[in-house]
């Protein structure tokens, strides 16, 4: 899967689960997760954990 498709899927899940605006997400976060080989589901779970714990 290419990065753009991966990013669209991850963003759609975040918007659906949090109601946040897409522009609220840091792009560097997604690049790092993609480069680390995470699936978009793993990246979303990690993002939400970091968001709700205050790390973001």
Regions from the PLM with identified roles:
Residues 1-56:
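C-terminal alpha-helical interaction appendages
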């Amino acid at each position: 899967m290419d990065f753009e498709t991966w990013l669209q899927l991850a963003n759609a899940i975040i918007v659906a689960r949090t109601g946040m605006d897409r522009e609220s997400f840091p792009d560097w976060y997604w690049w790092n997760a993609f480069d680390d080989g995470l699936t978009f589901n793993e990246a979303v779970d990690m993002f939400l954990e970091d968001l709700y714990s205050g790390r973001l």
